[in-house]
């Protein structure tokens, strides 16, 4: 039985010359767990908004075709009624949290519908989402993962047949991401809910989903069982989707070396153990260490930071933190949600002040610096690029700080930055209306406009497809010609292992590990303690040989390949 059907669905946003959706025909069976994949801008979110009636009832435009959800025609049914059929959790889920306490928020939708059992429905939704016992907590006491689960509980309280989640784990560490997907699995298998996720993380799709829907240019390419879908490596990559790393490695081995393996291509590490079993013993090799840096750019000296909650309870973020960042380093700060990564950055740019201790730039205390001086030392690019846009055009945003400070030649400098970040053709467009990758490039141009010595980036690759990630990766490499020291806070372990020459691991406001990628990921106890997870291909290598330390598909192929000169090839590749 189909719970969702679309017939020739075509939709134009107001004023658009090209459709966001083109003749979409789809059937989704009741009880399915469907992942929707596709490049940024292919129409995934637009399609999902058509399922719960936001399009066309709330977001106007030209709507053609028919959408049926649990027997209701969305064009002839109001959004309030459809919300009880298809619950939606947005990518920016924090905007769905409306009430101060957990139970209050979970039951709020039911209260709006004047349901007499609103509190019971809220409690049941919290129980199903694993938040039992949190009913009286304030929402700001929750972790990022718990807040996401609360948004899900709010949608679930109306007891819809369909639950739609847009990028549910984009801002979460692996432990919180696992918890979200385990809850979704329970809702699907135990409560027979139909789950639809928009997702870039194909390793989670492989572990949890039943079918995959590929979209491109507003059209449906295909809907296939997950095992078959993720084996279409070339097709997925052409659409800027990362298949699981184990699948890419197997595909390349079969294509380049004629390795057959067992059965089809693996999509999980467990399947990979069988496929890669016939491989030869790995070549032993070491990655060259980066040149040792001596000069200190910034130092945290016995820094403590705490605050009191609304209940008057003290909460400590950092206690006697000591940390030095050297000039010229590429540093990745990692750790679970709530570990203190973003707070560390806010302290560095002066948005927060330490309760105790000091932060020094070139040996000079931050407390004695005015904002003009500090902004020349350090700049921060926020996780949400939209927060960087305050003017009507990209060019005006890039020029803003320089113009405000009377920087000589700021117009010429603006043109240089627009050209360097490939923004010249977009200079007169509103930054808020650009694509994901374009927004990131624009926010980076704004961040380095004053030529800071240190650049801080918070989650620079969140929610991005392959093409946009590669774009940002290239931009990060270009940073060495622009700014001296770069520090990123991220959950993206592929980026960490490919880019950083030093990794700092935070847990509960403490530095529990600090070193190279081998020193960090080679210590299983530490990474479990920190709630982080290495790239999937690292786990695949470890499953085949406990001494194997490979962080990219290329390194895996060189490590386990048959080339006699693999050691030389490897060194050439990583330098």
Residue ranges of predicted features:
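Helix-to-loop junction immediately C-terminal to a conserved catalytic motif
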Residues: 52, 349
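Conserved ABC transporter NBD signature motif
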Residues: 60-72, 357-365, 374
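Conserved ABC ATPase "signature" region
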Residues: 117-134, 408-426
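Conserved ABC ATPase signature
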Residues: 138-142, 146, 430-434
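Conserved catalytic motifs of ABC-family nucleotide-binding domains
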Residues: 159, 451
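Catalytic Walker B motif of ABC-type/P-loop ATPase nucleotide-binding domains
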Residues: 163-166, 455-458
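Conserved ABC ATPase "signature" C-loop
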Residues: 217-218, 508-509
């Amino acid at each position: 039985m189909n719970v969702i059907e679309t017939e020739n669905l075509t939709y134009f946003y107001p004023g658009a010359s090209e459709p966001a959706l083109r003749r979409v025909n789809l059937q989704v069976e009741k009880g399915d767990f469907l992942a929707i994949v596709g490049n940024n801008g292919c129409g995934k979110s637009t399609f999902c908004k058509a399922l719960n009636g936001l399009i066309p009832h709330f977001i106007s435009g030209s709507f053609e075709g028919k959408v049926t959800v649990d027997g209701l025609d969305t064009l002839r049914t109001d959004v309030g009624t459809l919300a009880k059929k298809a619950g939606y959790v947005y990518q920016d889920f924090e905007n769905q949290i409306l009430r101060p306490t957990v139970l209050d928020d979970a039951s709020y939708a039911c209260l709006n519908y004047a349901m007499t059992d609103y509190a019971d429905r809220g409690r049941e939704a919290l129980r199903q989402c694993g938040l039992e016992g949190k009913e009286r907590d304030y929402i700001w006491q929750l972790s990022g993962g718990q807040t996401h689960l609360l948004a899900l509980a709010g949608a679930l309280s109306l007891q819809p047949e369909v639950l739609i989640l847009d990028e549910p784990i984009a801002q979460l560490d692996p432990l919180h991401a696992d918890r979200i997907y385990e809850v979704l699995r329970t809702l699907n298998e135990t409560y027979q809910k139909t789950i639809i996720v928009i997702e870039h993380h194909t390793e989670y799709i492989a572990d949890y989903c039943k079918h995959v829907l590929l979209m491109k240019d507003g059209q449906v390419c295909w809907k296939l069982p997950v095992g078959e879908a993720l084996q279409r490596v070339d097709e997925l990559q052409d659409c800027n989707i990362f298949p699981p790393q184990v699948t890419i490695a197997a595909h390349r081995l079969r294509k380049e070396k004629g390795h057959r393996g067992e059965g089809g291509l693996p999509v999980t590490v467990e399947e990979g153990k069988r496929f890669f079993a016939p491989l030869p013993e790995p070549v032993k090799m070491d990655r060259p260490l980066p040149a040792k840096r001596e000069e200190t750019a910034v130092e945290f000296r016995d820094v403590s930071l705490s605050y009191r909650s609304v209940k008057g309870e003290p909460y400590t973020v950092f206690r006697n933190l000591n940390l030095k960042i050297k000039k010229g380093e590429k540093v990745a700060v990692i750790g679970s949600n709530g570990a203190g990564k973003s707070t560390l950055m806010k302290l560095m740019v002066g948005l927060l002040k330490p309760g105790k201790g000091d932060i020094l730039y070139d040996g000079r205390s931050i407390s004695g610096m005015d904002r003009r001086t500090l902004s020349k030392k350090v700049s921060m690019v926020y996780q949400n690029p939209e927060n960087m846009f305050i003017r009507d055009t990209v060019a005006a945003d890039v020029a803003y700080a320089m113009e405000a400070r009377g920087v000589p030649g700021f117009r010429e400098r603006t043109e240089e930055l627009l050209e360097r970040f490939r923004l010249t053709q977009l200079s007169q467009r509103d930054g808020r209306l650009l694509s994901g990758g374009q927004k990131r490039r624009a926010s980076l141009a704004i961040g380095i406009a004053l030529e800071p010595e240190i650049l801080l980036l918070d989650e620079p690759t969140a929610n991005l497809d392959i093409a946009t990630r590669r774009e940002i990766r290239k931009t990060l490499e270009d940073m060495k010609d622009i700014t001296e020291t770069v520090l990123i806070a991220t959950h993206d372990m592929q980026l960490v292992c490919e880019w950083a020459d030093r990794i700092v691991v935070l847990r509960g406001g403490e530095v529990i590990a600090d070193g190279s990628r081998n020193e960090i990921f080679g210590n299983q106890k530490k990474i479990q303690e920190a709630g982080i997870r290495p790239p999937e291909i690292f786990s695949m290598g470890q499953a085949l040989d406990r001494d194997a330390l490979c962080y990219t598909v290329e390194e895996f192929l060189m490590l386990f390949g048959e080339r006699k000169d693999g050691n030389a090839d490897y060194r050439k590749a990583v330098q």
